[in-house]
């Protein structure tokens, strides 16, 4: 199933349209609708209210601007790493090899990788040869277009099939990537959208992992299915699948262990969990969401390749873009993996977690000409 971006939507329990867009991009599809989406109000059209379903307010311009400002500030930590000082490299407005070489260096240093950087630069060099880039404005416009062309195919909404009860999302990733925090933030968004949510504490190996997830469950008023430390993770998640079905849960978020991705036993364990989930529902898990620490750079790309090969990843969350990461790894993953990037995280607070939008991300990286110098 094709899945993508979204600040999740959800559901008021009543018959609804056969297909509706909810909130920041989460799409709900159902052959026999069980729920009608309630919108977060982030970058979405407002649906007309029915007598028993009040309209949900759209995201205000101030909210949109607030997220964009935080995104730009966190990605750049001051000056735009990609376009700062470019005006000084374009004497008389002439775009030459020196300017393109500088851009190439910046892209590689920002973890875009050689392959992705070559793809971007080849597009720009061909335009220079055709004399289409004769000033800084034209260069920035072409650069923006090249980056968006890479990212847009990965900016896909997350699809929740309402005929799947529960819609089971398996969260995977190495220790320290931010899986449990991501689960907590997703649970919060789902609750805001009136989804009935349950968490499964499948990381039974890491010290205090179960307790950490239970704290998120209490914070969001969401039930957590857990067993003791050292319990069989597959058994925990199987129990959670049964409980979610019995309690008519909309979405189940399953945490997993995250020991080093180079350990074969971890991948085998995750494969076992997938098999066990499919015994309860042959179509489960309905989403395999990989959480990556963006500050890991090219190592995050290697993690994505290994997890995808082993498990068939259907969506990615990139966390910690507020740290040392400059965002280039987002371009590398979109270019080389061509997997949907669901969400990005730029901080610890719930407001620092949002759906991935290609245009906003690129605009946060590239300052307008008036600010470049």
Residue ranges of each PLM-predicted region?
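Non-catalytic terminal/linker segments enriched in charged/polar, low-complexity residues
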Residues: 4-156, 163-170, 192, 219, ...
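P-loop/Walker A NTP-binding module and the surrounding RecA-like catalytic core of P-loop NTPases
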Residues: 115, 148-373
């Amino acid at each position: 199933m094709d899945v993508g971006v979204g600040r999740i939507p959800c559901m008021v329990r009543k018959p609804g349209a056969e297909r509706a867009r909810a909130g920041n991009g989460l799409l709900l599809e159902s052959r026999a609708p069980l729920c009608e989406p309630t919108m977060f109000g982030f970058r979405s059209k407002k649906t007309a209210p029915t007598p028993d379903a009040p309209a949900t307010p759209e995201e205000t311009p101030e909210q949109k601007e607030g997220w964009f400002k935080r995104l730009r500030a966190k990605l750049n930590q001051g000056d735009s790493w990609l376009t700062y000082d470019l005006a000084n490299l374009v004497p008389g407005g002439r775009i030459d090899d020196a300017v393109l070489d500088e851009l190439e260096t910046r892209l590689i240093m920002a973890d875009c990788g050689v392959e992705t950087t070559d793809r971007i630069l080849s597009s720009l060099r061909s335009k220079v040869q055709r004399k289409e880039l004769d000033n800084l404005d034209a260069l920035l416009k072409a650069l923006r277009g090249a980056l968006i062309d890479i990212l847009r195919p990965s900016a896909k909404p997350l699809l929740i099939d309402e005929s799947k009860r529960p819609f089971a999302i398996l969260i995977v990733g190495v220790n320290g990537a931010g899986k449990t925090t991501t689960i907590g933030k997703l649970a919060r968004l789902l609750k805001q959208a009136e989804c009935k949510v349950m968490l499964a504490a499948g990381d039974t190996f890491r010290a205090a992992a179960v307790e950490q997830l239970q704290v998120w469950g209490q914070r969001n008023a969401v039930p957590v299915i857990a067993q003791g430390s050292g319990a069989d993770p597959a058994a925990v998640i199987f129990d959670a699948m049964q409980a979610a079905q019995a309690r008519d849960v909309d979405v189940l978020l399953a945490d997993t262990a995250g020991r080093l991705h180079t350990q074969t036993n971890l991948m085998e364990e995750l494969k076992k969990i997938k098999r066990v989930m499919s015994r309860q529902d042959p179509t489960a898990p309905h989403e395999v969401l990989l959480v990556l620490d963006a500050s890991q750079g090219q190592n995050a790309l290697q993690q994505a390749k290994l997890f995808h090969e082993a498990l068939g990843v259907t969506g990615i969350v990139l966390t910690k873009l507020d740290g040392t990461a400059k965002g280039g790894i987002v371009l590398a993953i979109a270019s080389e993996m061509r997997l949907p990037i669901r969400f990005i995280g730029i901080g610890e607070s719930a407001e620092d977690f949002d759906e991935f939008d290609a245009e906003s991300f690129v605009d946060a990286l590239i300052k307008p000409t008036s600010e470049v110098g």
